Design a protein with these regions (language model features):
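Conserved structural core of kinase catalytic domains
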Residues: 12-61
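A conserved short helix/loop substructure at the end of the activation segment
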Residues: 190-202
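Protein kinase catalytic-loop region centered on the HRD/HxD motif
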Residues: 71-83
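Short, conserved alpha-helix in the C-lobe of eukaryotic-like protein kinase catalytic domains
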Residues: 151-161
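Conserved end of the kinase activation segment
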Residues: 133-145
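Activation segment/activation loop of eukaryotic-type protein kinase catalytic domains
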Residues: 85-128
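Conserved C-terminal C-lobe helix
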Residues: 177-192
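Activation segment signature within eukaryotic-like protein kinase domains
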Residues: 66-67
Length: 202
């Protein structure tokens, strides 16, 4: 099973990473999981967020679990001066139905003067891309390290959209949940100005 850049397999009811290497960024990604053992032996269930969405209707509890899990992990990266280019549902691993982890070492980039350098080609039709990626026409290009929060906000709305399919736009979905405690968090992630995007949880 491929989740992000991790090739994960199950043997004797335990999960293992098949493509472990000694690359510094890869090892930092594994450390960011903060699990009891790196061989995933404490895990009883594991799936990608893309598959998890097909089985579970997102609610307030699930959404808050996702945000809190990613907040802790992203803080781990930020302390080491790293950020993410962008994320989507195929980059997120769900452990034991309540822990959500970013798993793509290829999208981890070092921060220099508050910015990250995008060097990889990407698909402009990806619905999770920040607007700056869509309007950009050159590779490489620099962008604020906080730009990817937009991806996070859209990803959460996409998960909620699977529950309320009658809501046709992300704006309608966000407005529908304006009384929930994660509303402000998502609103801050979706700030039109990338330098003003914030990931704050309550």
């Amino acid at each position: 099973m491929l989740v992000g850049s991790l090739d994960i397999y199950q043997k004797n009811n335990k999960y293992y990473i098949d493509n472990v290497n000694q690359d510094d960024i890869f090892l930092m990604l594994i450390d960011s999981f903060q699990l009891d053992e790196n061989d995933f032996s404490t895990i009883f269930s594991l799936s990608s967020l893309k598959e998890y969405m097909k089985q579970v209707n997102f609610n307030n509890v699930t959404t808050n679990n996702l945000l809190r899990s990613l907040y802790q992990q992203l803080d781990f990266f930020r302390e080491r001066n790293y950020s993410i280019s962008f994320m989507d549902v195929s980059d997120i691993m769900v452990i034991n139905n309540d822990k959500f982890l970013f798993c793509n070492a290829d999208k981890l980039l070092d921060i220099k003067n508050g910015k990250i350098l995008i060097t990889q080609i990407y698909d402009k039709t990806n619905i999770f891309l920040p607007p700056e990626f869509i309007t950009n026409d050159t590779i490489p290009f620099s962008i604020d390290y906080s730009a990817f929060y937009y991806s996070l906000g859209i990803m959460v709305l996409h998960c909620l959209q699977q529950k309320d399919k009658k809501l046709y736009s992300f704006e309608e979905i966000l407005d529908y949940y304006k009384e929930y405690n994660f509303y402000f968090t998502i609103s801050q992630c979706l700030n039109i100005n990338p330098s003003k995007r914030k990931f704050i949880i309550f």
